[in-house]
């Protein structure tokens, strides 16, 4: 009976959260999404620095080029100037497509982090879990956003991830782990940039000043 009561309370809490989110204005939702994307990018930058502290000397030479990131097939604005010329619907679609494309890679990184041949693998593992939490939270927030923006903003590009193995030897695992994190850091910067442009538009600020 107690378990049923707890389940009912949890259901009501989630229901109230959803209802309150839908009652919030578009500019406030944009602000919250921007804060989460900023944290996501900050965490990915911190993780990249952690990995840099114990990287094989030949790692930079052996690491794949950025063009090999699995999300490189998605055409996105190259800089802020280009992003300012893209519509709201397309920017939110690009942000959601990039975020969704990292669900499986983050699962792989999460499973590999605890045994990564790196002296800070415990901290790295903890930060990867944080990335997953923030990614999930941001994704949920963007889902609410697009429901407010209308059907034309709901398109998502499917970007498959085919790399399910980081390798067997220590060097390969470190290099491939670092490569995936560098790709995620690049994409988290794009997501953050797109959402900041959208936030400025929603608050009627001049986007070029953001």
From Swiss-Prot:
Q: Does the keyword Iron-sulfur apply?
A: no
Per its UniProt record, what InterPro entries does this chain match?
4_helix_cytokine-like_core (IPR009079), Somatotropin/Prolactin (IPR001400), Somatotropin_CS (IPR018116)
Tissue and organ distribution: Pituitary gland.
* Residues in the signal sequence: 1-23
Cellular compartments per GO CC: extracellular space
Superkingdom classification of source: Eukaryota
> Can you provide one Gene Ontology molecular function annotated for this UniProt record?
superoxide-generating NADPH oxidase activator activity
- Cite the entry's keywords alphabetically: Disulfide bond, Hormone, Secreted, Signal
Task: Set out the biological process GO terms recorded for this chain's protein.
Answer: cell surface receptor signaling pathway via JAK-STAT; negative regulation of gene expression; positive regulation of gene expression; positive regulation of leukocyte proliferation; positive regulation of phagocytosis; positive regulation of reactive oxygen species biosynthetic process; positive regulation of receptor signaling pathway via JAK-STAT; positive regulation of respiratory burst
**Compartment(s) where it occurs, according to its Swiss-Prot or TrEMBL record:** Secreted
PANTHER family, per database record: PROLACTIN (PTHR11417:SF5), SOMATOTROPIN,PROLACTIN (PTHR11417)
The similarity annotation says: Belongs to the somatotropin/prolactin family.
Record protein name field: Prolactin
């Amino acid at each position: 009976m107690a378990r049923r009561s707890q389940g009912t309370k949890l259901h009501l809490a989630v229901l109230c959260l959803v209802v309150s989110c839908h009652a919030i204005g578009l500019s406030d939702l944009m602000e919250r999404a921007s804060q989460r994307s900023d944290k996501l990018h900050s965490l990915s930058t911190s993780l990249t620095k952690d990995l840099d502290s114990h990287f094989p000397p030949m790692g930079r030479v052996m690491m794949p080029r950025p063009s090999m990131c699995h999300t490189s097939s998605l055409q996105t604005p190259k800089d802020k100037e280009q992003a300012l010329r893209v519509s709201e619907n397309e920017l939110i679609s690009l942000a959601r497509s990039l975020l969704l494309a990292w669900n499986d890679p983050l699962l792989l990184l999460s499973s590999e982090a605890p045994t990564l041949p790196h002296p800070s693998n415990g901290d790295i593992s903890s930060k990867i879990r944080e990335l997953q939490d923030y990614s999930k939270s941001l994704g949920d927030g963007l889902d609410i956003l697009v429901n407010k923006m209308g059907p034309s903003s709901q398109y998502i590009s499917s970007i498959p991830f085919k790399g399910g193995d980081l390798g067997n030897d220590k060097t390969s695992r470190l290099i491939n782990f670092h490569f995936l994190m560098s790709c995620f850091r690049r994409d988290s910067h794009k997501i953050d940039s797109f959402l900041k442009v959208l936030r400025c538009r929603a608050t009627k600020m001049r986007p070029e000043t953001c």
